[in-house]
Amino acid sequence: MAGLHDFWRGRRVLLTGHTGFKGAWAARWLHRLGAQVYGFALPADTDPSLHVLLHTPLAGEMLADLRDAQAVSTALRDAQPEIILHFAAQALVPASYRDPVGTWTSNVLGTIHLLEAMRTHPQSLTAVIVTTDKVYANNESGAAFPESAPLGGDDPYSASKAATEIAVHSWVKSFFSGRHRLATARAGNVIGGGDWSADRLIPDIVRAAQRQDSVVLRRPEATRPWQHVLDPVHGYLCYAEALHAQRPGLPDSLNFGPLDDQRITVGAIATDLTKAFGAPAWRHEPQQDIGEKGVLALDARLAAQSLGWRPRFATQAALDATVSWYRDWLSGGDAAVLTDRQIAAFEDGL
């Protein structure tokens, strides 16, 4: 754990998407590590918002849209970062059907605006561009996707993230060779306390419990690579450190996901969590299905080989930590205290 503190203490970090769920956890951890975090994001769009509840001190902040190229360029100039962690995105599959153009412009054009700002930036930069486990052409064979699997995507969100991967590859090969160090990170379905996004399983269950209503499942038989938010964030930090040190032989992309034997269906998780939160039993409404893939798994062995990264949470432990956070917060606990406690426990295991 001392190594993380030694590397990140005093580092200037531009974190996009710091007002989102994963971004709020990352900002909190980076602050604890002593980094100077500059945030760039839209205002938090959920109420409650983990970002608002945590009140994490920032070295600077710009609330703006990635689709505003001038704002992105200004943020990079003002932050003068050594390292960029790019989380900001339209990250919900259902929302991508409602606004496909907005999803594509946010995810692809927004990332290109960041890449262009980097292209004209005078100093060398290290960047981890976060995409998703859904960038792969998924034939639902059940096999876990390695990083070499073909990219694809049927729904607008998945396709936009696959296109983002191609854009990053193009800018790296065309403009950044020998100057900036970039890589993409692909993580599975992230869970943890403090997520209140719409159309996500655990936030939907928490809301249903508060209303004493049944949560509606689109595909209860679907499996996903569930993982606690601290596992992929730890992976991103390790990846950024290795890139910054110019460690030889690093892959251009890495998967961060649970062990391959940790496959649990949506229905099984919903059954356990509705009981844990005292909510009515879930119900299945097939007409709500929007064509999402039923099987999805990541092969994260390359991250273990190249970074020494491995998930610290088994899936059940990730679910237990998530339930604990929400229960304590709903009982009046302080979100910052709860979050710091879980980060500290995670650090103790490193």
For the regions a language model picked out, list residue spans one by one:
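NAD(P)-dependent short-chain dehydrogenase/reductase
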Residues: 139-144, 148, 156, 162-244, ...
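C-terminal substrate-binding subdomain of Rossmann-fold SDR/epimerase-dehydratase oxidoreductases
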Residues: 32-33, 64, 209-350
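N-terminal Rossmann-like NAD(P)+-binding domain of SDR-like oxidoreductases, especially those catalyzing
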Residues: 1-187, 345-346
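Short, solvent-exposed loop/helix junctions and linker helices
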Residues: 16, 66, 105-108, 157, ...
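Residue-level detector of flexible, active-site-proximal loop/helix-junction positions
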Residues: 44, 68, 134, 189, ...
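Residue-level marker for well-ordered alpha-helical positions
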Residues: 24, 70, 203, 267-268, ...
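Short, charged helix-to-loop "capping" segments that act as catalytic/coupling loops
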Residues: 45, 79, 119-126, 175-179, ...
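Residues in well-ordered alpha-helical elements
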Residues: 69-70, 82, 94, 101, ...
